Amino acid sequence: MPPELAHFHSPSYQHALTAYNLAHEIHGDAILFDHAQAARSNRQLWRDYPELRGQYWQIGSSGQGDFWLLRRDGNICWYDHDLGEITPAAIVDFAITFDQFLALSAYLAQIERTLDTNEHYFAAPAHRQAFAHALNHIAQGLFARYPYRYFD
């Protein structure tokens, strides 16, 4: 485990990083980094934005320039590259743990498989409502915080 990560409160992420090969897409908007990629990404992040060192650990990306962060307190956060310079104020706290992030990712992967076979799935109001309910079941208010819209 990288020594910098020891001060972050997320035993499940620390275990996953050291025990598994995390380098894979867990759903369309989340690609987790393995140990080596995480170390490289965080060195770059902290070189460019030293004020984030010790406060945020980059765990993955969207593949489109946005990225997922673990905050020191264990919460998962998100940064939208369209906002420009990275500042703590530009980082959105999802108020979820790594385990909840994995639950969210598993659910979104399932939804994406459904959309692959039925692109009009969300045309049904009941499906939109079930989606919002599922995200809010993972964490209260998560549907409102989630940045990628599957329907509007």
Pin down the residues of each PLM region:
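N-terminal capping/interface segment
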Residues: L102-L104, T117, A124
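Generic alpha-helical structural element
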Residues: A90, A124-H127
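A surface-exposed partner-binding patch
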Residues: M1-D73, N118-F122, A132-D152
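Secondary-structure transition/turn motif
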Residues: R72-G74, Y79-E85, H127-H137
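Compact, glycine/acidic-enriched structural inserts
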Residues: Y79-R113
